[in-house]
Curated annotation (Swiss-Prot):
Any one GO CC term of the record: cytosol
Any one biological process term the GO annotation gives: DNA recombination
InterPro entries, sorted: AAA+_ATPase, DNA_recomb/repair_RecA, DNA_recomb/repair_RecA_CS, P-loop_NTPase, RecA-like_C, RecA-like_N, RecA_ATP-bd, RecA_C_sf
Native organism: Thermus aquaticus
Annotated Pfam families: RecA, RecA_C
Positions of ATP binding: 65-72
Record-given protein name: Protein RecA
Family under the similarity heading: Belongs to the RecA family.
Amino acid sequence: MEENKRKSLENALKTIEKEFGKGAVMRLGEMPKLQVDVIPTGSLGLDLALGIGGIPRGRVTEIFGPESGGKTTLALTIIAQAQKGGGVAAFVDAEHALDPLYAKKLGVDVQELLVSQPDTGEQALEIVELLARSGAVDVIVVDSVAALVPKAEIEGEMGDQHVGLQARLMSQALRKLTAVLSKSNTAAIFINQVREKVGVMYGNPETTPGGRALKFYSSVRLDVRKSGQPIKVGNEAVGIKVKVKVVKNKLAPPFREAELEIYFGRGLDPVMDLVNVAVAAGVIEKAGSWFSYGEHRLGQGKEKAAEYLRERPELLEEIRAKVLERADKVVLAAGEEEGE
């Protein structure tokens, strides 16, 4: 760079720094953190599918899908992981449907969880912004976008038309919120439902409430829905299989998938999840119904194999380390359908 240009740039940078504070503009190579901070999801398979090891801090994540598909369970599991790491979590319960007993079974420290049950969409989003601005909250979950009803709609008469109010509310809030989250390094997770557009003959009839702003401002979007038959022990259904597809990812390649197993009453089982991922990576061998790792015969059936590993934490960690070494194989196995 020419000397005159360099001096002009330095003067401009000094003026900006004086006006807006230190660090307002800096060279990318001088940035203190190029690595993305994350909160683990509680599922190794999903962490690998995300490509960064979890849900990104300082950004917006959208978890959407049909009802009873595991969206809230996944969000509460992420809260539990944040708390295990010494973090502070908040749950904005716009649906007024949070079950503290179920949250506790998923590993959430309900005594320390910050909970808000706002009356209007404006109130909910203002609470999210104020919590993020504090810089003391690690993750904020909003359940759900569909329940963020604008004040004008609540105070209006039944049958009044309020076209586009919620979309405008979300757009205004997210414009401010994204900058606040980035500075405070807070992860914001918005849970959303899917609706069907009336009269769509071609293409995907599904849409999500809240307009386009959330799709645009989200760094990660996860499509969560049931897949296949329920998990059964004998004739009794004990859980559901859930497919999570990363439909948008600004931080790693998108369109990767992970299959989770959610058990009724206890949610995600991390050991069972590890067994599934280790089989996909070729670390654990499966012959018929028998599972084995090297010289260790883990057991007949996945439940027995998981039980064997729970009793041997050192072996469990050894398998986890080998799975992480072969992460590419797991991602390839999860995304095979895309490449067919």
